[in-house]
Amino acid sequence: TVMGAQVKEAAVMLPLYTFCIEFVLGGFKRKDGEWNRPILTLYGILLGLPMVAGLMWVSARMLHFDVVTRMMTEARVMFDYMHWTLLPNLDSLTLFHDDIVPSKGLLDPSTTLAAIVGIAALLAVALWQRKSRPMLALGILWFFSGHLLTGTVIPLILVFEHRNYFPSAGLLLSIAALIPQFNSAWNARAISVGTGCLFLFYAFTTHLRSMEWSSPINLAASDASKRPNSSASQYEYARILLTTTKNGDPEPMRQKAFAILERMAADPNAEATNNQLLIVYANELKRPVDPKWWDSMIAKFSSRKPTSTEATALVALLKCYDAAFCSRDIGHMRAALEAATSHSGGYAMLYAAFGRFAAKYLDNRELAELQFQRAIARAPSDPEYLLQYAELLIESGRFDEAESIIQQLHTLNRFDLLNSQLARIEEGLVRAKSNQTTH
């Protein structure tokens, strides 16, 4: 498990998969029928302690919808995964599925309740068939176990079909476990023909999908056409168009990209990443920046907590300012940062970005200090925010407080990874003290 986790985080689920095997095939019993206490203790440690730690970690790190909303939505998504695995529809096979509307209640949409009941029924079947059809039970448990890490409370994107690598094996195991039930000669022939047709269908669908993957522009265009309301699909298509030419002329592609981005920027349900890309490329191509792009971005940040991709995009836009690559619209940038950081449980990188912006462009050290303090409170073990805060304190002449922050950084300097940053900031502190004494 430890070795696998160095390559792929999903390897941490290996103890849960073996737990399912033990539950179905052994029942945690010894040969004499008594409980196998060492096995129970082992799984209590391997599964119980990480579960408690994980729940504590995610308690304040949710996306802009709460845990209940996420869990209700994921119930519907589980059946989408089953559909895409067993009977894939080319129109539904895309990289992004962010246009799936989160469930707002058990009957909004109505399929939410049906999905929850369906999952409960499948788990009940697994328990019921554990002894008579163990492979059927194990396949069902493996499918849901495979989604326990990414499809429950951890704040990841709601839908990502590539999460089905191992869970799909559980589905196929369950289907394979049912085939022996049809053991007459006629049924055997029917099953052989049906299986052959199914494999031909899978092969043909895979061939069509591979054609869509033939080039980045083909894949992006295909996904965007299938999901016109997917912010991520439209963003990716526009991004690729902006770096593509048609017969050596980039302008037709650029016009198409800007039309896509402007439509998504005006959509209140689309991510603000589209607005950010519009602003950055308008600067790069020496085009005017429409104030409406800023206004709709600010409105999106005001109405809900930014997603992680939106937070990253806004920080990147500020870096575009720092590099003097983008024209500096200080008023709009301040409004965007204020809106993005107005929600509880925000991202530390946004608070730190606001702090840098306040210090550099507003000359407001009080506001900058407040934002850095918020960043450190959200990520107290991240040395980057402490380093930036210490620099601000040194520039403000508050040397004692800066030294206190530097001491905190020394405690975080594991394996001497921060030596160069600490040396730089300590030299700056000594120089600032010397300059103050001289003057």
In which residue ranges do the predicted regions lie?
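Polytopic membrane enzymes that build or remodel cell-surface glycoconjugates and lipids
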Residues: 1-275, 280-292, 306-311
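C-terminal luminal/periplasmic domains and tails of membrane-associated envelope-modifying transferases
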Residues: 217-439
